[in-house]
């Protein structure tokens, strides 16, 4: 259930409006004036609340819905309780998310912690730094020599924007973030604790142990990227580390030097991408995926959670396992191993 103390609705929406905005069909047109100001899981609901149910797996819940309105598929709509305004959509969850973005626009991007506007008197703006009108720099933030922050961008408390870094417009850089040697596009969201542009892991064996291989590249983050809390992105050794437009990266992800990530990829938490890995466009990585250095993942490939990738993955394929292999092969091997173990147990009892 949405808590007004944290997320107050921009305004009330009528069910008829929601139908028009999402493309859903209101099953009973006489209910178009019912108002919505809250969102909740299907099991909760309540007055002025919209819920959704998506897929057969949750179909058993539909009879107990007590919300003002329900988004669901055509096949589930006939089982909805009387008195609930039913909005029929082929993609209920996507329609619900659209309503959430409209009802709670402040949730689309984190807001200033202190409520300040403009540049806080407790921020440090170095000589030659440029902060465009409309940017918000909160207390304790440091904007380095020659750095720039675009209009509408929020820089949170105790964040450091390194010398000559640039951040585009309408972005967000959360508290306790460190940016170095980085060029950031427009509408980029960087959550608290992320560390971007630090040294890549570059060392060479020498006569007295390992010697540092200087990392002299950059990090380039294109427009509309979102980076989760405590994620780390190393700068390139010679070439740049690049995060493509529209890519979404979860918390606690490690991206090594010279990695190139394509457009609109999704990378779940605890993934590790070694140096010089290349991901195509629309790649999806489940949680805890590890990719060895210099591996290439083709466009629209998908890697299951906890996969250990040691070979290139062709475009459009789905891989799983350690070492990762095509998903069907991985599942057949798991089934064969299970069968072998069962046979061995039977043999030992005989």
Curated annotation (Swiss-Prot):
Entries under Pfam families matching the protein: Hexapep (PF00132), LpxD (PF04613)
Active-site residue numbers: 257
Pathway: Bacterial outer membrane biogenesis; LPS lipid A biosynthesis
Cellular compartments per GO CC: membrane
Job of this protein: Catalyzes the N-acylation of UDP-3-O-acylglucosamine using 3-hydroxyacyl-ACP as the acyl donor. Is involved in the biosynthesis of lipid A, a phosphorylated glycolipid that anchors the lipopolysaccharide to the outer membrane of the cell.
Quaternary structure annotation from Swiss-Prot or TrEMBL: Homotrimer.
Protein name: UDP-3-O-acylglucosamine N-acyltransferase
Organism: Chelativorans sp. (strain BNC1)
Lineage, uppermost ranks: Bacteria, Pseudomonadati, Pseudomonadota, Alphaproteobacteria, Hyphomicrobiales
Gene name per UniProt: lpxD
């Amino acid at each position: 259930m949405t808590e007004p103390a944290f997320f107050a609705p921009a305004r009330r929406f009528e069910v008829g409006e929601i139908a028009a905005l999402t493309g859903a069909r209101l099953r009973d047109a006489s209910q178009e004036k019912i108002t919505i100001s809250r969102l909740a899981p299907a099991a909760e609901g309540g007055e002025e609340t919209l819920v959704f149910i998506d897929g057969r797996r949750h179909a058993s819940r539909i009879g107990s819905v007590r919300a003002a309105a329900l988004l669901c598929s055509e096949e589930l709509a006939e089982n909805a309780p009387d008195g609930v305004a039913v909005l029929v959509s082929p993609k209920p969850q996507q329609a619900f998310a659209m309503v959430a973005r409209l009802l709670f626009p402040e949730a689309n991007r984190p807001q200033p912690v202190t409520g300040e506007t403009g540049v806080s008197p407790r921020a440090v703006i170095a000589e030659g730094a440029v902060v465009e009108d409309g940017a918000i720099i909160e207390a304790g933030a440091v904007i380095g020599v020659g750095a720039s922050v675009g209009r509408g961008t929020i820089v949170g408390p105790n964040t450091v924007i390194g010398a000559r870094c640039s951040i585009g417009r309408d972005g967000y850089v959360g508290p306790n973030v460190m940016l170095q040697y980085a060029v950031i596009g427009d509408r980029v969201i960087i959550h608290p604790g992320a560390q971007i542009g630090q040294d890549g892991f570059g060392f060479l064996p020498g006569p007295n142990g390992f010697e540092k291989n200087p990392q002299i590249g950059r990090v380039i983050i294109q427009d509309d990227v979102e980076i989760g809390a405590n994620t780390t992105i190393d700068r390139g050794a010679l070439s740049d580390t690049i995060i493509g437009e529209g890519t979404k990266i979860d918390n606690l992800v490690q991206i090594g030097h010279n990695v190139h990530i394509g457009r609109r990829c999704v990378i779940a938490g605890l993934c590790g991408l070694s140096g010089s890995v290349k991901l195509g466009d629309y790649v999806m990585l489940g949680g805890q995926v590890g990719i060895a250095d210099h591996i290439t993942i083709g466009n629209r490939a998908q890697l299951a959670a906890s996969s250990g990738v040691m070979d290139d993955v062709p475009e459009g394929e789905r891989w799983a396992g350690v070492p990762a292999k095509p998903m069907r092969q991985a599942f057949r091997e798991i089934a064969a191993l299970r069968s072998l173990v069962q046979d061995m147990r039977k043999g030992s009892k005989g």
